[in-house]
Amino acid sequence: MNVCSKKFALLPFVFLIGWLLVTAGLAVAQVSVPTHYLGNGVNMEVVGYNDLQGRPSYMPNVQKQGSRYILYASEHVGTGAYLNPMNGKMEYDGTSILDVTDPQDPIYLKHLPSLYGPPNNEARHVRTCAGSDLPGNLYPGKYFMVRSDGQISHTLWDVTNPANPILISKLIDNLTYTHKESWDCVSGYIAMPKSSTTWKSTGSACTTIPGAGCDIAIFDLHDPYNPKYITDWGLVGQTPGSTVTPVPAMVHETVISTDSVYGTRLYGAYGISVSGDGWLQVADLGKILALGHPVATDEDILAAQIGVQKMSYEFGMHSFWPWLHIPMADFAQNYPASAGPVPGNTNPQVQDFGLASTESTNNGCVGWRAMAVVVDLNYPSEPETIANMSVPALQGKKEFDFCANDARFGSHSISEDLYLPFHNRFNAIAWFSGGVRIWDLRNPFQPVEVAWFIPNINKNTEQNCATRNGVTSCDTVVGTNNAATDDRGYVYIVDRYGSGTDVLQLTGNPKTALFNLTPP
């Protein structure tokens, strides 16, 4: 039986103002933005908005280009072609490029469609680097973008003029699966998820070759005009000749990050979603390079792998991000610890962690609840989950019953930004119908949610449907898909279902704490 209803996920904004003003004394956003663009929140307010031409968006990436701040918003495959009012043409999804130098007035500069038509008319992921940030400073004044084009290619672009991107090359082509790249501008190395005809994985039909799967391709991209393939990468059991069973779940993202103390590491998230059979992996890129040849065996992986954590089956891992060198105010009086049997941190006053998230993939609260977790990396060979970040389905009064609608509810991804004021202090986590949630992680053992914001639906918001006990129903509900931050303290969110992008800022005590750069 199919029952289709179109209704709002939340009660009217005016009602919510009244409720919030009588609870906790927390402020609600009231800014000079059209009323139907305002949302509902605590300790966050809208600064600016753009509808992104009504396109479903996957992730925002903010790049400072000289004195300008440029937002690159990647796009999911939508219901078809959308009108680009800048040229009057119907275009498939790709990348929206905006100037957000003035966050109150985001200016749409360019829509860059995917290189391909259906079903690959999308570009879900985007990463950028300044030429001056890459090793060797070979191209000062230039800016580069890598994106996934459909499920076919990872492509490289010159975006020095963001209103006129120029295709440089296809880094990898002729694939059947692409996903979330990670480009480390410090080392120049990039990790790109892809389909493989030889490497193995479970959990997704990401290749048409029986017994094959998905892995990571690592390139040296310090010179964008001369990319160099380094190796494929994955988990023990996924290499071409491995006989390990069961074969581990597919990779979603491997972050490459360079640290002044630990060098360049890989932080891999495998399994993706709830019931995804997740894994977290830490590896040393220097040891991969020291092999002198592409990784081909499980023994090669073990030579470079620092540690791995098998998650409980319900937690597939979507993202894994380093959260290192955290000043621990509560440990300020602790003396150094004795060295352990394996290499690790011995200073309790400054500790190492990672942030990871599961993706909520089931609409209507069917199955396990997705959440984010904190991982202890003081001894990276033995990573250990120590805390979680979860949002209750019934938050306050009944207008916040997130399981009462047909949308996704749960975590999707953590924000991956490397600069203050957010980095190593607060993190913005996208929570689909739960909007964006801001977590204070200055004490990673005890994460505290300090702010949140849920946009309202608008004329562009697409429907979500869920099937429970054989009955299908539909709602029009927002889906905050990803969040990013910049060095000015703004938060950028994009909507999976076409509601646009919001530029937000913290208010009240969280804003004060964010810009107080001393330990709590």
Protein language model regions, located:
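Bacterial N-terminal signal peptides that target proteins for export
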Residues: M1-F15
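Short intrinsically disordered, low-complexity coil segments enriched in acidic
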Residues: N2-V3, L20, D99, D158
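Bacterial N-terminal signal peptides
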Residues: P12-A24
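Feature marking well-ordered beta-strand scaffolds used for ligand recognition
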Residues: V28-P520
